[in-house]
From Swiss-Prot:
Region (Disordered) residue spans: 1-44
Domain of life where this protein originates: Bacteria
Keywords: Ribonucleoprotein, Ribosomal protein, RNA-binding, rRNA-binding
Annotated protein name in UniProt: Large ribosomal subunit protein uL15
Gene Ontology CC entries for this record: cytosolic large ribosomal subunit
Biased composition (Gly residues): 23-35
One GO process term, biological-process aspect: translation
Binding partners and assembly: Part of the 50S ribosomal subunit.
Record Pfam families: Ribosomal_L27A
PROSITE patterns tied to this protein: RIBOSOMAL_L15
GO molecular function: rRNA binding; structural constituent of ribosome
Length: 144
């Protein structure tokens, strides 16, 4: 076998079908759209069901968007094990170390995983289990 004898696997390469380029191509004139009618002309808008009341309008409206909603960046306890014993952990320190990318409305510490270090953690929110786990490890918490 030589380089000039290499061939692609059968069926792996497709030729783009150019429609509307003469009747002998098999897809000339009407370009595979059939005869006249709405679908033979322009595009139909997304969600259009041929004049039938569309699904997104048949289903009732629900809920609202709370404009004062606060979204917190979540940090799990097992991520805090990368710090040394006795470190004071602040939101700026978490951002500098790449644990948090976007602070959003603040930082919330959750009790996912085990904490093996004695740390002072300063954050905007804590789960009750996270506070218990930090204090059990000999550390302390402070709400900002």
């Amino acid at each position: 076998m030589n380089l000039n004898e290499l061939q692609p696997a059968a069926g792996s390469r497709h030729v783009r079908n150019r429609v509307g380029r003469g009747t002998s191509s098999g897809n000339g004139k009407t370009s595979g759209r059939g005869q006249k009618g709405q679908k033979a002309r322009g595009k139909v808008r997304l969600g259009f069901e041929g004049g039938q009341m569309p699904l997104y309008r048949r289903i009732p409206k629900r809920g609202f968007t709370n404009i004062s909603r606060k979204e917190f960046a979540v940090v799990n306890l097992n991520k805090l094990n990368s710090f040394d014993d006795g470190t004071e952990i602040t939101p700026t320190l978490l951002i500098e170390n790449g644990i948090v990318k976007n602070q959003k409305s603040g930082i919330k510490i959750l009790a996912v995983g085990q904490l093996e270090k004695k740390l002072t953690v300063k954050a905007h929110k804590f789960s009750a289990a996270a506070v218990a786990a930090i204090e059990q490890a000999g550390g302390s918490t402070e709400v900002l």
